[in-house]
């Protein structure tokens, strides 16, 4: 049973994490935090499913995840650990010294992307930071659905039960539950354009160090049509994170 496998994975993961705690106080705090996280996760299963924006965002993250898996740079499990967007982390993919923020847009002005916070595109503490920009056209019954992309990755992990359990657990953390699949079966995505940009010191974005004291939680837009000079090929990008 898939749900039993996922629950077993969650419990096993909790036990492993507790074993690494060096004090009882840390272990108790970790358990309480993890239980709160599980409560939030399972409450999503009782909701009305993902919003259109959330569906689209998850689709984009899965698109990048699929590319990363196929490159074979890391094991399946390690690749899934890199996918931290479901944990509401600052960026969607976090490696040892690199990170990727994924943005999926389906509106008319597909080059206009919203950046949430002054740290999201701040590379100060990283060797490499990238922006994965996916422009899609959403329609009914013409393209790939979110369910299709989920199933594609599940087939990829089918022979690695541990990886499949991690993937399914992360889907639940993202708010994707199989009993909601009917809600997503008619919204399809066709890729209009996908690009990867390297974020360096001259890239047009806000850095935390540039803000005046008292200014925080900034939300701003970038027009990536002006950022062609920062575009890199997929090969260049993936070779740089090996």
Residue ranges and their predicted role:
Residues 1-88, 105-242:
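Nucleic-acid endonuclease domains
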């Amino acid at each position: 049973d898939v749900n039993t496998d996922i629950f077993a994975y969650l419990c096993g993961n909790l036990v492993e994490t507790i074993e690494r705690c060096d004090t009882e106080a840390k272990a108790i705090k970790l358990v309480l935090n993890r239980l709160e996280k599980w409560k939030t996760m399972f409450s999503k299963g009782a909701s009305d499913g993902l919003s259109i924006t959330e569906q689209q965002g998850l689709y984009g993250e899965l698109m990048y995840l699929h590319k990363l898996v196929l490159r074979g740079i890391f094991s399946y499990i390690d690749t899934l650990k890199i996918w931290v967007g479901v944990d509401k982390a600052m960026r969607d993919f976090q490696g040892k010294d690199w990170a990727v923020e994924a943005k999926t847009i389906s509106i008319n002005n597909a080059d206009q992307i919203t950046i949430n916070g002054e740290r999201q595109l701040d590379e100060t503490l990283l060797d490499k930071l990238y922006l994965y920009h996916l422009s899609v056209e959403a329609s009914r019954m013409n393209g790939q659905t979110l369910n299709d992309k989920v199933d594609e990755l599940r087939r990829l992990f089918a022979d690695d039960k541990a990886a499949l359990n991690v993937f399914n657990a992360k889907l639940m953390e993202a708010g994707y539950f199989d009993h909601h699949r009917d809600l997503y079966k008619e919204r399809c995505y066709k890729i209009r354009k996908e690009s990867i940009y390297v974020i360096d010191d001259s890239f047009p974005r806000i850095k935390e160090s540039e803000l005046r004291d008292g200014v925080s939680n900034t939300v701003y837009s970038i027009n990536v049509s002006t950022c062609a000079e920062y575009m890199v090929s997929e090969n260049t990008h993936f070779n740089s994170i090996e």
